Amino acid sequence: MPSKDSDETEDKSDTTQVIGNEILFYGEISVENILEFIEKFKKLEIELLKRSADLIDYSPVIRVHIMSEGGDIFSGMNAMNVIERSRVKVITIAQGACCSAATFMLMGGHERRIGQNAYVLIHQLSTEIWGKFHEIKDELKSCKKFMKCIKDLFMSKTEIPEKKFDKLMKKDLYLDARKCIKYKIVHAID
């Protein structure tokens, strides 16, 4: 009979893999998955900082590959904040599809790239609201704040014209590598 510990290990999602100085995040943007990402990211960051202290002319870089259909807005913002504050240069790379809340992780990179055949999807938030009328009004106020936050983020980090951004937010349109470079969502093709 397998032990309880082995059952728990089998259930672990492992959406984040570390290979050398590369982190592969392939999964949903959720509290659990982003916690796993942050744990592995911080461990690699510390390891690379120690290595840079020992080696002359060594400039550490973390490459974060992101393939995700999106998920929780707050978890995506959390990952972006951690990446932005890294003491090691971070290159974020959109792979496959980098959608919705996953684009926040992408935006956190000191340098942003995209795979030749990858796509980015930026769109308005979606939520479910139920409750008493005043609770619904409060939720609507919060959603408006979040939408402003998303717009401010992309207006400050990209060169998407405001009218184009407003159109993108109303539809689910995937942007290819060429469009992502044009609007400075990313800096280069990886």
Can you describe what each PLM-predicted range is?
Residues M1-D190:
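Terminal-region recognition feature
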